[in-house]
Swiss-Prot record:
Residues 1-110, 946-973, 987-1059, 1447-1475, 1487-1544 are annotated as: Disordered. Residues 1016-1027 have a biased composition (Polar residues). The keyword Phosphoprotein applies. Residues 912-944 form the LisH domain. The modification Phosphoserine is found at residues 565, 569, 955. It comes from Drosophila melanogaster. Probable substrate recognition component of tsome E3 ubiquitin-protein ligase complex. Plays a key role in cell competition via its interaction with l(2)gl. This is Protein mahjong. Component of the CUL4-RBX1-DDB1-DCAF1 E3 ubiquitin-protein ligase complex. Interacts with l(2)gl. The keyword Nuclease does not apply. SUPFAM superfamilies: ARM repeat (SSF48371), WD40 repeat-like (SSF50978).
Length: 1544
């Protein structure tokens, strides 16, 4: 005991010593346990990472709960905090008593806060009111609750409101309650921070205590305040200047509190810039204070530790204060660069010794309490030396990133200061070290400081920071900023390998056992450092990939089973957002990891390839310098992946990909892409792009394709394919970012374009085997794998995605690149026979649209990308057509030209040898070589008298019309048509010969050159000259082409042959003549493969197909009807003639038509059933248009109505309200409910017996039994097409179902085939012949599932079949609204031949069409027309048209007149000769004069606007251009319909 202590305090001191000894004994055991537990945490990690996910939190919680007991003066507060924590931790165990106590305590605290604020509101308006007790009480409440909150070990870098970070904490709730008191907050931030507050109240009292409490309370509630809003309002009234003065020179703890407020204010960049001058003056002073506080703390701590067992607490305090006195007269440690900072000149009103005495007095009390257990934070009250240092560090941290303060850091030796704080850290108290590390991280963003830090051994000091501890979070920030500086990382990578190994081990430890913010920093550290090979190798050596993968494998947002636990209160929007950020960082790190491995692997491959090359390459450089960073552009990466794919075995293994697959990383990445559809955050594009880039690199190993084809479990328990997610990203469904689209296309290209036959050379990346048997097995496996990839891509609508991307025009800067990549993917996909067959029928190829795209780039600056698009477009055309692509004119490679070139190339050219000899003979005679000519005549047996040579103009026909003024057709003219056939001809040989210019026309013995074609003179070919040099190509067969190629882009050079070089075959007369005849053959409009012998004297021309007499334009209806008796089938022309004419017959309207809107209709015998917008079903008699009866069927619009053939059952459907479909029976003139189908949006009857109903619910089809109402079968596709307007339908025999583009077998319930999707709306219908399916514009063959043809006129049109073998196509209702901008004929319907889908007519009704129905025998059609306008009231009614009836003159005159008012019964009764309609049209009159006579008005009368064909009456849309000819004879329409019905 010290002798200076008074006798009155002896007993108290002795009691205090005994209590402290007892406390030390109790806490020493806990300290040992903590140390032992910390030692265990440093052991190697377990293999199962998910079990380690929350180790740090559990350990910290255990230390918090068992850390020790507080001093006697804080027993109440600490006990309350511990009781709340225990109650919250044990709530799951069902401790009702603890829960009740905690709830009572929270309620009491809330009540206490409310009472204090209410009391303040009542008294604060009184004169002389003292707010100090109120502020003190509030500060104590918030300090107590903040202590409880901090003991839960929240993330120190989490800047969210405490209530959002932990909704169960009382601290956050109290903050919300306080901030609702705007009056109090205004007083606190404005008035209570004034030095003259009491003097303004006419009270003679110092405001120092009030200012201290105000600063203290503001700092305690700062986590719930918006810093920018608070200090920007305080900037104008001088509050910040006052705080600067307090921070610079004031008494403690006001000086420290003011520094803390400045630290928060400097986080706002605008404030930091505005107060730049004050900061420049204050920063050196703060650094000096830190030097002094550090020196005093270390010295005092050393003395206390050495004399702890010999000296009392008072003597320790005396020793500490003596150090303060000495330090106050001493200067701070000087920097080698600068001696003194000039701060000593300013005098202080409050001496440093007195200030620090207060701080260290409080530090002694805090140290005696907390030296045996882990300290979670540094309290603000009472203010200690650690509190002051913490707040100064925060102030310096907020300014550390500014360049102007970097010089001050060097001048004041900040690095030595930081090193002093980080040396010999105590595991139980690293709170101050955490603040120091944050300050260090702010300085490490400067390259100069980072390099200095590394050179002075800073990295070694960082790695000595104990873990687990709060300072570990600071280390994660520091190493991230170090990795951000590449020069610093290069120096680190050149250090000793054990140090690098320890760095990687430390970062991996952070990945597994720290807060989320620390994990993010560690992940970003790895993503920046993977480019250095030494880090990459060490990462793999320590199983880093598994630990990195485990960071996201335990996240709830990626776990489909998480949806089962909807009551998980820990999972909220903030947690979900934080998890998405974590996924983003991990995906970026995985991308950098795989790209770095790929870079070094590719350079290793280059080293093997160029091993024999003496010249140094970049590959040698990188392999000899493993610390050099590896960087690749997007295009370089894709090209190198393609190269490695060609040299990698089909069964190859690669350690990074193998490990990622073993961990399930490929599936996880696909799940991330699929789940990101529903994510709405700024980093979604980067997340998806990074995941796709990882998959792109992994595609080097073909086994990855299997994972992409497998099914994934989604959050809604549905399944999808990996390729479905990739295709969705390529289509822009996830993000419209061009980089995401290109990354997705890269994955598709690497998969569908993967080589089947891979190079098995010595430069292969990895060789699986060399035996012939293994090669065959590998080849078979490769084919099966690639075919599986093709099938998966097609099943997920890959064709339509790639086709749409090939025609994209935006974003304009990347459109050319996207088109090129999409074209390459489709070209690779076209290696599949199925895809090739489908693509060949699409308009993009069949109509020449691709050639249009190939002409010009979208952006002229992107011509390089456009050239790539042209390259793959030609490759695609070659594969689709099966023909060789022409080389001379690559911009016009239409399928027809390629087909023609292939026909010409396959033609065998034969000619008469005697004619050739005769030409040679004449040539020799004309050149004076008579003896040679006579010798030739004798040897070949030519006749003695030379026949007269026939000139071309004597030909019975001209095969090529010459332009006016042209005297001859030169050989170049002949060649002009060969541009499309050169490649096909040249493709059969390995020689590409060329020779000189064409010779002049022949002389007297030649043909007449006046009007015909001049034959080249071959005498200029001297066979004794040096042979022409010919370059060999890769072709295997012999070519007949000797056409000149020297001036063509792809031509071969011409030169003299050298000795010992190539030995080409000589050009012969036969090849010259053969090419000449081939050129003639290429001019034919319809070339054929098998040709007769060519005549050298006459130009060749293949015969044109002769038009059939039946199809002649002069073959009219009368003669055609007569030829029918002779056995000719003329029904097609009759059908086209009849369905060219439509005449309105009757309009059906209700009596209250102004209030009713018709939506749909169905013709049933002599009645017509109509659905309305009001949900009614109404029945009208077609004879008189009178409404028979009606019933309310739905609460909303009736979208579809259909009656069975018997007319006693009606099914109605409404899309918007439940029940959506109802089956009604019609009896006694009323609708009677028979069956409700609540979830079925569309329904139709079966075709044969009509005892079943087929309902549609989204992509699912369900079959119901009408009699029992039970469900017979359900058909849900595995991979749905998701048509927006799917309507399931049955075939004519009820054996097949088509729903959502999937064909089903009704009896077995199995999927038969999934048709490719080429539109978003219409799923398709069966053709009545049961052999074809029409899905929008595509016609599919049910026997082979081939695409037969496309019918563009049916685009977005519903098909209705007539018994007369025609198809009516119309855009109905919602379909019209869906594509209003793209639909061509919204007010018309098309009539097509059901046999060949040729267009018969397009009938414009000049009004929108809501529905269309056909009668049982096809003689009538009913159209629901919408007569609504922009300014007129909407009016709809049903107009019935008579098929085959020509419009009268009256109807043409009234075509544009207003719609007349209806009669009293609400219908148009027509003329006196209106006919009654029975089941078989027995009362239908004979329309004898269809040409339009004067009594047309007596035969057929209409009162409304009528339909008008877009085509003329006498010219239909026949493809052959024929005229149906109705000038002679009569045509009985009734007989025609009766005959057709009997044929059916």
């Amino acid at each position: 005991m010290s002798e200076g202590s008074g006798s009155e305090n002896a007993a108290a001191a002795e009691a205090a010593a005994e209590a402290e000894a007892a406390t030390e004994a109790a806490l020493m055991a806990e300290a040992v346990a903590v140390a032992y537990q910390s030692d265990e945490e440093e052991q190697p990690e377990a293999e199962d990472m998910p079990e380690q996910a929350g180790d740090n939190q559990e350990e910290d919680a255990a230390e918090q709960q068992d850390g020790g007991e507080p001093e006697a003066d804080e027993d109440a507060d600490a006990d309350d905090a511990m009781s709340v924590e225990n109650a919250e931790n044990e709530s799951d165990s069902g401790g009702n008593a603890e829960e009740t106590a905690a709830a009572d305590r929270r309620q009491a605290t809330k009540k206490e806060l409310t009472q204090i604020i209410d009391k303040w509101e009542q008294q604060q308006t009184q004169n002389g009111y003292d707010p100090v007790p109120t502020l003190r009480s509030l500060a104590e409440i918030f300090e107590r609750e903040k202590d409880v909150y901090r003991r839960k070990d929240p993330d120190p870098l989490d800047s969210r409101h405490p209530y959002r970070a932990d909704p169960s904490c009382q601290y956050g709730l109290l903050l919300k309650l306080l901030f609702r008191k705007d009056t109090f907050m205004g007083k606190l931030l404005n008035d209570y921070l004034r030095e003259n507050y009491f003097s303004r109240q006419n009270v003679s009292r110092s405001s120092l205590e009030l200012n201290i409490l105000a600063c203290r309370l503001i700092l305690e509630i700062m986590p719930g305040m918006e810093t920018s809003a608070v200090f920007q309002t305080a900037e104008g009234d001088g509050t910040i200047n006052r705080i600067y003065s307090w921070a610079e020179d004031s008494i403690e703890p006001l000086q420290s509190y003011a520094t803390g407020l400045l630290a928060e204010a400097m986080e706002v960049s605008d404030i930091a810039i505005n107060f730049r001058d004050l900061n420049i003056r204050l920063v050196p002073k703060m650094i000096k204070r830190l030097h002094m506080l550090l020196a005093i703390s270390k010295s005092a701590t050393s003395d206390v530790n050495t004399s702890m067992h010999n000296l009392s607490a008072d003597s320790s305090t005396a020793g500490m204060l003596s150090w303060v006195a000495c330090a106050s007269n001493a200067s701070a440690p000087q920097s080698p660069q600068h001696n003194g900072s000039g701060l000593g000149a300013s005098s202080s009103q409050h001496g440093d010794a007195s200030n620090m005495s207060i701080l260290f007095e409080n530090s002694r009390d805090a140290f005696s309490v907390s030296r045996y257990y882990k300290r979670m934070y540094i309290p603000l009250h009472p203010a200690t030396a650690d509190t002051s240092q913490m707040l100064i560090m925060r102030f310096l941290t907020s300014l550390g990133e500014y360049q102007e303060f970097l010089a001050m850091a060097f001048e004041n030796n900040v690095m030595q200061l930081i090193f002093g704080y980080l040396e010999n850290l105590d595991r139980r108290d690293t709170c101050l070290a955490y603040e120091v590390l944050k300050y260090l991280a702010s300085l490490l963003c400067h390259k100069k400081f980072a390099l200095e830090f590394i050179s002075h051994g800073g990295l070694e000091l960082l790695l000595k920071v104990p873990r687990p501890s709060l300072a570990t979070t600071g280390v994660s920030i520091a190493i991230y900023y170090l990795a951000y500086c590449e020069d610093a990382m290069e120096r680190i990578c050149s250090m000793q390998r054990p140090l690098i190994s320890e760095l990687v081990r430390y970062a991996l430890w952070i990945l597994g056992r720290c807060h989320d913010s620390s994990k993010c920093h560690a992940t970003m550290f790895f993503s920046l450092s993977f480019q250095f090979k030494v880090i990459l190798d060490e990462f793999d050596a320590q199983d880093g990939l598994r630990k990195l993968y485990n960071v996201i494998s335990v996240l709830k947002i990626l776990d489909p089973s998480h949806n089962d636990s909807d009551n998980d209160s820990d999972f909220n929007e903030d947690v979900e957002c934080a998890s998405r950020q974590m996924v983003r960082h991990v995906c970026v790190a995985l991308k950098r990891y795989m790209e770095a491995h790929f870079f070094y692997k590719y350079n290793s491959f280059l080293c093997q390839t160029n091993a024999a090359s003496p010249a140094p390459s970049s590959a040698h450089y990188f392999n000899q310098n493993p610390t050099v960073a590896a960087k690749l552009t997007f295009d370089q990466l894709n090209d190198q992946i393609r190269t490695l794919q060609e040299h990698t075995s089909i069964r190859a293994h690669w350690q990074p990909v193998d490990q990622l697959m073993k961990l399930g990383g490929i599936t996880m990445l696909l799940r991330i892409i699929a789940f990101s559809y529903d994510w709405v955050n700024s980093g979604r594009s980067e997340t998806v792009r990074s995941a796709l880039d990882v998959l792109s690199v992994c595609c080097i190993i073909p086994r990855v394709y299997v994972v992409l084809c497998e099914r994934l479990l989604m959050l809604d328990k549905t399944t999808t394919s990996g390729f479905c997610s990739v295709l969705g990203a390529a289509a822009g469904e996830i993000s419209s970012d061009a980089e995401v689209i290109k990354s997705a296309l890269a994955v598709l290209c690497h998969c569908v374009c993967s080589p089947i036959i891979r190079k098995d050379s010595g430069t292969s990346l990895i060789k699986f085997g060399t035996s012939s048997r293994k090669n065959k097995a590998n080849h078979k496996y490769a084919e099966e794998l690639i075919e599986r990839v093709w099938e998966s891509v097609c099943s997920n609508n890959g064709i339509v995605v790639l086709l749409s991307l090939m025609q994209t025009k935006g974003p304009i800067t990347d459109a050319d690149c996207i088109r090129g990549m999409a074209c390459r993917a489709l070209a690779g996909l076209a290696r599949s026979d199925r895809v090739r067959q489908i693509v060949s029928k699409l308009p993009l190829f069949a109509s020449g649209q691709l050639q249009t795209l190939m002409r010009d780039p979208i952006l002229q600056e992107k011509r390089a990308e456009h050239v790539i698009f042209q390259k793959y477009a030609l490759e695609l055309l070659e594969r689709v057509s099966g023909k060789t692509k022409p080389l001379n004119n690559p911009l016009d490679p239409s399928l027809s030209n390629m087909h023609k070139a292939n026909v010409i190339a396959q033609t065998r050219i034969q000619y008469n040898k005697q004619q050739l000899y005769q030409l040679i003979f004449e040539h020799l005679e004309s050149n004076g070589l008579s003896q040679t000519a006579q010798m030739l005549q004798r040897e070949v047996g030519l006749p003695l008298q030379t026949p007269t040579t026939r000139s071309f103009h004597q030909s019975p026909f001209d095969y090529k019309s010459l332009p006016s003024g042209s005297s001859s057709l030169s050989r170049n003219r002949l060649r002009s048509r060969m541009q499309d056939v050169n490649a096909a001809i040249m493709g059969n040989g390995d020689l590409n010969r060329s020779f000189g210019e064409d010779s002049s026309p022949a002389g007297a013995g030649g043909s007449n050159a006046g009007d015909g074609v001049s034959i080249p003179n071959f005498s200029s070919l001297n066979t004794t000259q040096t042979p022409i040099k010919i370059r060999r190509t890769d072709r295997s067969s012999v070519s007949r082409s000797i056409q000149k190629q020297a001036m063509e882009p792809g031509g071969m050079s011409v030169g003299l042959a050298e000795d010992g070089q190539l030995h080409p075959k000589r050009i012969t007369l036969n090849t010259i003549v053969t090419e000449y005849l081939t050129n003639q053959h290429s001019l034919c409009n319809n070339p054929v493969t098998t040709c007769p012998q060519f005549d050298l004297y006459e130009p060749h021309k293949c015969p044109d197909p002769k038009p059939s007499r039946l199809l002649s334009s002069n073959y009219n209806l009368t003669s055609r009807h007569a030829r029918t008796q002779a056995g000719f089938n003329t029904s097609r022309f009759d059908r086209r003639y009849v369905h060219t004419h439509f005449s309105p017959w009757r309009s059906i309207r209700s009596a209250d038509y102004e209030d009713l809107e018709f939506t749909c209709c169905d013709l049933a015998g002599k009645y017509i059933i109509v659905g309305t917008q009001q949900g009614d079903g109404r029945v009208f008699n077609m004879n008189d248009g009178v409404e028979q009866f009606f019933s309310n069927c739905h609460n909303f619009s009736v979208d579809a109505i259909k009656a069975n053939r018997a007319g006693d059952l009606v099914i109605t459907s409404s899309f918007w309200r439940t029940p959506t479909s109802i089956l009604w029976s019609i009896a006694d003139d009323e609708f009677k409910l028979k069956l409700r189908l609540p979830d079925v949006t569309y329904c139709e009857f079966s075709q044969t017996v009509q005892d079943r109903l087929l309902g549609t619910q989204n992509e699912c089809a369900t079959l119901f039994d009408i009699n029992t109402g039970s469900k017979v079968a359900s058909f849900t596709p595995t991979i749905p097409n998701l048509y927006t307007k799917n309507r399931a339908t049955l075939c004519r025999t009820d054996e097949l179902i088509l729903s959502d583009g999937v064909l089903w077998d009704v009896r077995s319930g199995k999927e038969i085939h999934k048709f490719d999707k080429f539109n978003q709306c219409i799923s398709g219908v069966f053709h009545p012949n049961c052999l074809e399916i029409i899905a929008n514009t595509e016609v599919w063959d049910l026997r082979t599932f081939h695409l037969l043809q496309t019918v563009p006129v049916l685009d977005q049109r519903n098909c209705t079949f007539s018994p007369m073998h025609v198809i009516y196509g119309a855009s109905l209702g919602a379909d019209r609204d869906h594509d209003m901008e793209t639909t061509t004929y919204d007010t018309s319907f098309n009539v097509l031949d059901a046999y060949d889908y040729s267009s018969i007519a397009t009938i414009d009704v000049k009004r929108n069409i809501n529905d269309l129905s056909v009668s049982a025998n096809g003689s009538l059609i009913a159209v629901v027309e919408d007569y609504s306008g922009y300014e007129s009231k909407q009016e709809t009614y049903v107009k019935i048209y008579a098929v085959g009836v020509k419009k009268s003159e009256r109807s043409e005159e009234e075509d544009d007149e207003e719609v007349p008012e209806s009669d009293e019964d609400g219908s148009d009764t027509g003329s006196e000769n209106t006919f009654a309609i029975g089941q078989n049209l027995l009362g239908f009159p004979l329309l004898r004069n269809l040409h339009g006579s004067d009594n047309d008005d007596e035969d057929l009368d209409e009162d409304d606007d009528d339909g008008e064909p877009l085509d003329s009456d006498d010219d239909s849309d026949d493809d052959d251009g024929s005229d149906n000819g109705d000038d002679d004879g009569d045509f009985d329409v009734l007989e025609y319909f009766d005959r057709s019905s009997s044929d059916d």
